[in-house]
Amino acid sequence: GRLSEAELRAQCKVIFLAGFDTSAKALQWWAWLMAANPEKAGLAFDEVRQVLGDRTPCADDLPKLPYLAASLKEAMRIYPPAAGLLTRRATADIKAGSWVIPKGSLVVVAPWVLHHDARHFPQPDAFRPERFMPDAPPLPRSAWMPFGLGPRVCIGQHFAMTEMTL
């Protein structure tokens, strides 16, 4: 069906507010981590200088900036920008270890907890962009999810990564 004018306005507000606030938070934490880790900042700066020189970046430059992108992903791992927004309702009883989550229960997924799991991220509090470089070992699908996961994943995730990288 079609959205009413009020529904359309509400959806526009959600898209706008969800996008700028979370990207701003991610960049704020990224800047703090770069300032606290000058050797990592130097690697990102050198990569940007080598690829761009003095020119303005464009979308074609994204694949040429893997360390910069990895540093942003690592910042979102340590400080997920939407840490409390991931909720789901159990559509059936779920057995998790010795626990049973009854159908209809609200389940909160905590990206911060997942992102600090030492099984997937040794030294989880350390800022190590190398974890996200193209040659790094692959992560399990649910180990890193700053944009959510599955059918309700953030529709703006690719735009957000492009915007933050450029």
Give the residues covered by each predicted segment:
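Conserved cytochrome P450 catalytic core segment spanning the I/J/K helices
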Residues: 1-27, 41, 60, 65, ...
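Amphipathic, well-packed alpha-helical segments that form the structural scaffold of globular domains
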Residues: 9, 13, 28, 45, ...
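Cytochrome P450 heme-thiolate "Cys pocket" and heme-binding signature region
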Residues: 13, 18, 56-63, 84, ...
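Cytochrome P450 catalytic-core helices
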Residues: 22-47, 157-166
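A compact, surface-exposed functional segment
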Residues: 32-64, 70
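Conserved cytochrome P450 K-helix E-x-x-R motif and the immediately C-terminal K′/meander segment
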Residues: 55-97, 118
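Conserved cytochrome P450 K-helix/beta-meander segment immediately N-terminal to the heme-binding cysteine loop
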Residues: 91-95, 109-137
